[in-house]
């Protein structure tokens, strides 16, 4: 909610998740491999009766990418979902607020609110978001850093307007083992209804990465939208993604060379951001030249050990 309308150059890896045949979406997502979208688990399940939850049928979902508005999304930017995989330890009761046992500050927990949507034909006009391993995240991301949330959800709560790609800035507040919290900047802005599953991008000293996925609003604020959020931490779920998707998961580690500013008119809404592309160039470079040695080797090499890491991470 809040924030600013995106431009074509700012679409990056953000996608819209729709019910099949619908003219607009109900959730958002992020492209993490040419044929693979990550989104929130609660966007990819159905609950036919209370307490009975299962993955949505593949034929019931579509994804759209490369567009700024639902009204301008023609058939060329829409793909049918061929397979839906929901995390086997997804806690729907926790996400729906019916049971928050063990929740920490702001409602942070370990509900595994993540699902994968598979497509069979790649998009022509959407980028694959680079990801961070746990070790590189620890090195590059910290409390107080600036991040950007993008999605097709509600951007005007009073009027309930949605269906356009909006971007808002947020401050990383708490980084947990499976989720992270953001706090809003001034003025009000963060995720809202329909942004669920959408990306949280973070600028770092080595480029800009997909850090998390929108899960829900914080539990310690008064507003439903725009006042901080809870995000599924991608680095903690990389072992599950690699195990579930197999060779269909072709992660991108290099941010690349083409810079994409997420800021309106190049302006910097945060006067004193810490490091990253905001500090370097006054813009959030979704694809910027890396510094230091070999981010690609770091990520792709780590994938070889993800099956071993998954056992350790699952015990946290």
Indicate where each model-derived feature is located.
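C-terminal subregion of chymotrypsin/trypsin-like serine protease catalytic domains
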Residues: 15, 26-45, 53-67, 162-175, ...
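Short, small/polar residue-rich loop motifs at catalytic or cofactor-binding pockets
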Residues: 23-26, 193-196
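Solvent-exposed loop/turn segments at secondary-structure junctions
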Residues: 21-23, 37, 43-45, 70, ...
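Conserved catalytic-core segment of clan PA serine endopeptidases
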Residues: 6-7, 21, 53-124
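A cross-kingdom C-terminal cell-surface attachment/processing module
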Residues: 296-315
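Juxtamembrane/start-of-transmembrane alpha-helix segments at the extracytoplasmic/lumenal side
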Residues: 285-300
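N-terminal activation segment of mature serine protease catalytic domains
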Residues: 1-22
């Amino acid at each position: 909610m809040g924030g600013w309308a995106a431009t074509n150059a700012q679409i990056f890896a953000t996608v819209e998740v729709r019910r099949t045949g619908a003219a607009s979406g109900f959730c958002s997502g992020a492209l993490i491999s040419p044929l693979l979208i990550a989104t929130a688990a609660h966007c990819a399940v159905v609950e036919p009766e209370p307490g009975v939850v299962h993955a949505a049928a593949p034929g019931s979902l579509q994804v759209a990418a490369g567009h700024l508005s639902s009204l301008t999304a023609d058939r060329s930017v829409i793909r049918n979902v061929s397979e839906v995989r929901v995390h086997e330890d997804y806690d729907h009761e926790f996400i729906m607020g019916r049971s928050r046992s063990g929740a920490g500050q702001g409602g942070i927990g370990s509900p595994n609110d993540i699902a994968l949507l598979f497509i069979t034909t790649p998009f022509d006009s959407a980028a694959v978001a680079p990801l961070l391993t746990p070790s590189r995240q620890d090195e590059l991301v910290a409390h107080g850093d600036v991040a950007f949330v993008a999605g097709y959800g509600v951007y005007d709560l009073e009027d309930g307007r949605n269906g356009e790609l909006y971007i808002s800035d947020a401050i990383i507040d708490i980084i947990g083992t499976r989720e992270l919290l953001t706090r809003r900047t001034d003025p009000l802005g963060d995720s809202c209804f329909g942004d669920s599953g959408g990306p949280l991008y973070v600028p770092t000293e080595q480029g800009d990465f997909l850090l998390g996925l929108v899960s829900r609003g914080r539990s310690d604020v008064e507003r439903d939208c725009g006042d901080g959020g809870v995000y599924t931490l991608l680095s903690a779920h990389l072992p599950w993604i690699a195990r579930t998707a197999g060779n269909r998961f072709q992660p991108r580690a290099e941010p690349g060379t083409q810079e994409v500013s997420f800021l309106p008119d190049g302006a910097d809404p945060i006067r004193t951001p810490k490091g990253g592309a905001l500090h370097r160039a006054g813009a959030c470079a979704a694809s910027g030249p890396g510094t230091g040695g070999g981010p690609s080797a770091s990520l792709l090499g780590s994938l070889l050990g993800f099956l071993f890491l998954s056992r350790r991470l699952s015990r946290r």
